[in-house]
C-alpha cells in the first residue's frame, strides 16, 4: 500500500502495487511508476500501471485506471528512495553450485542468490555477485566482475546516490568471458542482464545494467555497451566501440571498431564512425572529404602580384 511508504511525499489516493517499473517499460501487473516529464504522460495509459508518483502539475491528467497517486516535486527521487528501501526485504536463497563446476579458490561467489551450472569454470579473482545465474559450460576468466553495481544515478539535493541493483544476471550456456570484464546486474526487480548462449566477450568489455545480448554475439576488447540495450543474435561489436544506453541493434548487424552508436541499428546493417552511420554512407563521405582535401592541397599557390 502507498500509505506504508516512509519517504517524504504527499499521498493523494492510496493504492496497491506489486512491482516498480519505469513508465516506458512496464512488464508486470500492478506496477508503481513515476512521471517527471509531460512527454511521458501517454505511457500512463498502460493498464498494468496501478500507482504513480508524479508532480502536482499533472493533477487531472492521470488516467482513471490508476488507483494510487503520490505527489512530489521530485518523483524520480521518491521512486528510487522507495526502490532502495524495498531492496532490504529481498529474500535470500542459499547459493547452488553444481558438483561438476570448477571454482578457483581465489574467486568470490556470493553465499546467496547465485546458481552455477554443470561444467562451468570460474577463474581466479572473479567476483560473482548476488542475483547471478550461470548456466552450463560457461567459462569466466580471471578478474571479471559478474553482477557488478550498475550506474543508475539519482540526485538528492546537492548530493547523489546510486540506485541499488535488485535485478538479475543470466549467463547462458557456452558463454565465454575473457579477463577483466564487468557485467552489471539489472537495476529494477524485473531487470535481467543477459548474455545469450555462446556469446563471447574479449578482455576489458563492459556490459551495462539490464542489457540483453542475444546468441553468438561477439564483443572484442575494450567495447562498452551501456544500460538497457538490446543486441540481437549474431551481432559483432568492434574493438573499442561504444553503444549508448537503450539502443537496439538488430540481428546480424555489425558495429565497426571505435564507433559510437547513438541510434538504433537495423538488422544486417554495418555502421561506422562517431556518431555511427551506415558504413557505405560513411565511406562515401570519407572519400568525398579526402578528395576535397587533395584538391585543396594540389591548388597552385596564389601569385603575388606587384605593381
Predicted region positions:
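Structural signal for interior beta-strand "rungs" in well-ordered beta-sheet cores
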Residues: 34, 96-278
